Amino acid sequence: MRFMDLLFTFPGILLAMLIVAMLGVSTVNATIAISVWSIPNFARMTRGKVLQIKEEDYIMAIRSLGARDTRILLCHVLVNALPVIIVIATMRMASSIMSIATLSYLGLGSPPPTPEWGGMISIAKDYMWDRPSLIIIPGVVVMITVICFNILGDKLRDILDPSLKD
């Protein structure tokens, strides 16, 4: 967990830029950079949920019945932690899309023939006054996609988290 805390100390986009600069400019390397940046969030939230589930009474009851640790982990802990992981994944997807668009806008995403929203905005900034639609349309599409993923994450949290139900 200390390594995850170390990753939390770096600003996410700077860490992604550093990784892409070391590995080279490509879609795969940008995806790796965003994944490395996202892992600490998953690790911290999953660890917290697992520690919470581990202290539940039914886990102690199952353990007293003689269940093995792998069975407890797979059948009870993972099943109860999965909703949190799914919600984090959908919420994190929105920020990952923004980060990929930012990296490609800065020239650290896919090479120019590959269509990326950030790359489209970067190229269109030269023609902003003549053809504003070239910059507005990719920006609006990024915004709508991010909002949709955030709404999806909110709805999944409402559906999957039993503590929020009245």
What are these regions (language model features)?
Residues 1, 51-55, 59-87:
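Amphipathic cytosolic juxtamembrane alpha-helices at the membrane-cytosol interface
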Residues 1-52, 86:
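Generic hydrophobic transmembrane alpha-helix motif, especially the helices
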Residues 9-17, 79, 83-100, 104, ...:
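Hydrophobic alpha-helical transmembrane segments in multi-pass membrane proteins
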Residues 11, 27-28, 70, 133, ...:
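Residues that define the loop-to-transmembrane-helix transition and helix capping
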Residues 19-24, 34, 50, 98-141:
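Glycine-rich helix-loop "coupling/hinge" segments at transmembrane-helix boundaries
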Residues 23, 36-37, 83-91, 132-166:
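C-terminal transmembrane helix and the adjacent membrane-cytosol boundary/short C-terminal tail
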Residues 29, 39-50, 54-57, 71, ...:
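Membrane-embedded alpha-helices of multi-pass transport/permease systems
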Residues 65-67, 107, 111-113, 162-163:
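A short glycine-centered flexible hinge/capping loop motif at secondary-structure junctions
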